[in-house]
Amino acid sequence: MKKIMWLILLLVLTSILNGCAKEETKEVIGIRGEIKEIYLSEDGTTIAGILVEGEIQEDTMYDSASVRIDENTVVYKGEEEGTIEDLEEGLIVEIIFDGPVAESYPVQGLAKEIKILED
């Protein structure tokens, strides 16, 4: 009887430890589309956000997004790192959001990464 109890306890502990293991999560592209509008900060000196519109594709989640940009947002031009100042209306970009988005229309969220696909 004791052996069965130990076996059950071992199985339960193994299940708990497996459930607590960190899984690697692949970052999901929130939206891929064209920058339609650029929002400036209150003082008008920096880009605070962009409006991106595209189509929902197999690897994207949204077709329209109001994207906030902060000092932690990383911008890439192709494979090289760019700057927020590289963003212009008409560019095609991919957005990876940082955390949850507000499920309004368009969705609203903070950009973790912006990748410029075309000039």
Q: What are these model-derived regions, one by one?
A:
Residues 14-16, 75, 96:
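Intrinsic disorder/low-structure terminal segments
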Residues 62-81:
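Beta-strand/loop nucleic-acid-binding surfaces
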